[in-house]
Amino acid sequence: ADAHYISPLAFSGNAADAWKKLQAIVAGSSRATLVTNGPAYLHAEFRSAGLGFIDDVEFALDEKAGVIQVRSASRLGVRDFGVNRARVESIRSQFAK
């Protein structure tokens, strides 16, 4: 298995409601800037505290599969010390509530 793989966010019920919930979570995140916020694709930039490095986080709605695919990557460097995974898992826990 890929060490960098992040499981999608699963949802049940209405896809539009799930998408709106995700949009609200990301929009309310500290140091997040929404770059693209469409009906099935969201791209946000998260700026790190301190040095201000930018991480790109993308979400894509897969309505048929009942999931939202996630991609999170640092723009600089190879190691992020788990910051991207921790951010996505924080979003996942808020999304699951």
Predicted regions and their residues:
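Ser/Thr-rich, low-complexity intrinsically disordered terminal regions
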Residues: 1-97
